[in-house]
Amino acid sequence: ESTAILAERPPMGWNSWICFGTSVTEDEVKANADFMAENLKKYGWEYIVIDAGWYAPGMETLEQYESSTPHQIIDKFGRLIVDTEKFPSAKNGEGLKPLADYLHSRGLKLGIHIMRGIPIQAVEANTPIKGTSYRARDIVNTDSRCKWYFGFYGIDMSKPGAQEYYDSLFELYDSWGIDYVKADDLLSPIYAHDEIEAITKAARKRKRPFVLSLSPGPAPVENIKHLQSVAQL
C-alpha cells in the first residue's frame, strides 16, 4: 500500500463529460491532451479524465445513457472493458494502455470514470470473480441500484468475493496505467460507506498510486472525516 501523499493541491485537468457526454472518442481525447500538453501543462494542468461511456458501444446520447438496459462490454471476469469503436487502440486486449502511454509520453496523466457495483451483464452471465471460487450472483445486491444509470447493481460487501471483485477492477486499471479514478454513485442520494471502503482498499493495494475522486457531489459534510480518510476529492 502506497503512503505517498496524492493531490496535495486540487488536481487540474479536463473531463470529457461536459463537452462530449458518453460519446467521446480516442481522437477527441488525444486532441484535448495535445492542447493541454502544449498550452496548459506549464501552468499545472495534467489530468485527462474519460467520463462515462468508454465501455458502451453506440452510447452517444443522454437518452441512450438513461436506457433501462444500457449495452456494456465486459470481460470473462465481469469487468467493464473498452469499446474499441470509440477507442481503436484498445483492440487485441490492450485496453486503455496505449492511450495512457500516449498521455504519459506528453507528461500528462489519464483518468477514467467508473460506477459503484457490478455490471448487470456480469450478473446475468454469472461471471466468475477473478482469483476466487465465487461468482457475480454470490456478491450482488439487486436491491441496490443507481437512481440515474441502470447498468449496475450494488455489491453486498458482507459477502465473500465482494472485496476481491473490486480488487480485480483496480488490478485491471493498474495494468492499463490509469492514474485517476472518478468513482460515481457513492455519495448521493445514498452514502455507500461499505463500497467506498472497498474501492479505497482496492486502490491502495496497488503499487501504482491512484488519485481517487468520489461522486456525485457535493460531499455530505456529516461524513467529512470518513471522506478525508478514503479519497483525495
Model regions and ranges:
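Extracellular/periplasmic catalytic domains that process cell-envelope and extracellular macromolecules
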Residues: 4-9, 41-43, 103-105, 174-175, ...
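N-terminal module-boundary/linker segments of secreted carbohydrate-active enzymes
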Residues: 1-30, 35, 210
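Aromatic-lined carbohydrate-binding/catalytic grooves of carbohydrate-active enzymes
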Residues: 36-174, 178-185, 189
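Substrate-binding cleft/loops of secretory-pathway carbohydrate-active enzymes
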Residues: 218-233
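Stable alpha-helical elements in mature extracytoplasmic
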Residues: 25, 29-32, 92-99, 166-169, ...
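Extracytoplasmic, non-cytosolic globular domains
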Residues: 169-218
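Short, hinge-like loop/turn segments at secondary-structure boundaries
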Residues: 128-131, 200, 229-231
